[in-house]
């Protein structure tokens, strides 16, 4: 068995920073799949990525010449020869397909019969000729939404590929990938005089890049170095860096030869609101702000250069100038915004389109105002304060700062509202209206914020359904699924007693003053929410059977649904709960066989067996005991009480003949079972739990 080190490096033009990790991981996984498919063994694989290269280093790859055994079974002997002993057409076709004559075939015999059979060993394609094909396949199978095309052959990848290295120990593996011939010349740093670095042995990778031009090919080592460097620099000026993994990941994907540099800016810019200042430094300039021990910003930031140079001062001065210009713009936008109060911008929303066929942001604001007023009746929020928050909710969208920094919407609204002496809860709601922004994100903390978030999301959902922008199986351009999950989470986790049916109807009514399509739209929205609710519970860890058992009962009150799902999950964990479930299954099967609908009242006088009287008494006792429990939605207590039916049901089936010769007694016993089924199905459809 011959084992060697295989190196593959793909030199590219600058890859998108936000996609680098995804692309490199896909390349790594796809390559492993290809190796497994071709039965090529190896010890381990390590992957590398920088803005201008993707690489794989495969240790102890087995390049031993290999054979594959081919087995092909033909027609049975009976069907292979005719009565005169000549080959049939079926046998002739099979021999031709295998490329053999009858003398090369053998007979396979077992207890089931006898067949023509062909077995041979075929030499597999040489691994050296396979590797370039495997590499190209692994690259082409990377899922990328937006690709670039280049060259006469119209090749396609995230960015044009310019260089290929395939090295097996010291040997260059000949072959083309994307019509580029492999060689032993690595792509050098963009700033280097020499465009390539010669590599003699695969084992020297990635050390040779670091030694020749300070290139750190390992993404994770590069990331750790950046973190360590910025923390050390911040400590030198008695500051610290707040953890921002998104920025760290982005910067790591932007550089391959990182050098952290401390840069200062004028202290006057510290008067700009903190969120604007941070956003300018982090989002616009991809730099790291520095904080003091009191968590206040210092007039410094750290820039990660992509070049190792003795002339760092020039880079620092250049970044000072750029940052000064950016902060000056931010200062101007902020001062310009503060010339007028936030509320005075309300009418300006008339000029801003919310969505085609759905009017302006001003009209959306008025709908939100009416909807939050209705929602406030079901929550602990003040109605007037809720209305005030609704009227101010979109005003910051026409400010200069938000136009320049869209990601600050809501945050700037809150800041300006506080500056205008609005109530704190009203101001806070302006930021909280956009929560949750993604799966697992925090929820609004204030009652007004919860109401505003629900109203805003519900208005958008209703509007999009109204104009037909409904998510398909694979497309959701307006992120309506996320909005629906946001509404569901707020209602459930904040325990707001909102009826989903009423909420949807109220929201639709604000778009549509009575229309025949109202009912169709309503049904579509209910179905949409129920699907989202099912998936959310499933992702949360609840059993699909339990979720279906509750949702199939058509309850629209989310809190009620939530309590039932929790209760059924609790019940399923109880000892012997399965015996109750199987009893319900038996009852359901008996009732399902009845062709005519079972109607009428149970008549105790028709009960002649002790077991049916005991069961009836248990039902009456259950009804009396659980009357208030149902009103209070204490489903755990109800299900514990349901367990008390276990023995009476068992004894009933053991001692009582349901199909009595007297039709009245038979009907009475079926009514008893029907009553039992209704008790169980009042909480959930237990048929999903069988």
From Swiss-Prot:
Enzyme Commission identifier(s): 6.1.1.14
InterPro entries given in the database record: DALR_anticod-bd, Gly-tRNA-synth_bsu, Gly-tRNA-synth_heterodimer
GO BP: any one term: arginyl-tRNA aminoacylation
Top EC class for this record: ligase
Keyword Nucleotide-binding among record annotations: yes
Localisation per UniProt entry: Cytoplasm
Keywords noted in UniProt: Aminoacyl-tRNA synthetase, ATP-binding, Cytoplasm, Ligase, Nucleotide-binding, Protein biosynthesis
Top-rank lineage group of the source organism: Bacteria
Molecular-function GO terms, alphabetical: arginine-tRNA ligase activity; ATP binding; glycine-tRNA ligase activity
Gene Ontology cellular component terms for the protein in this record: cytosol
Catalytic activity, reaction form: tRNA(Gly) + glycine + ATP = glycyl-tRNA(Gly) + AMP + diphosphate
Subunit structure: Tetramer of two alpha and two beta subunits.
NCBIfam families cross-referenced by the UniProt entry: glyS
Family label: Belongs to the class-II aminoacyl-tRNA synthetase family.
Name by which UniProt lists this protein: Glycine--tRNA ligase beta subunit
Gene: glyS
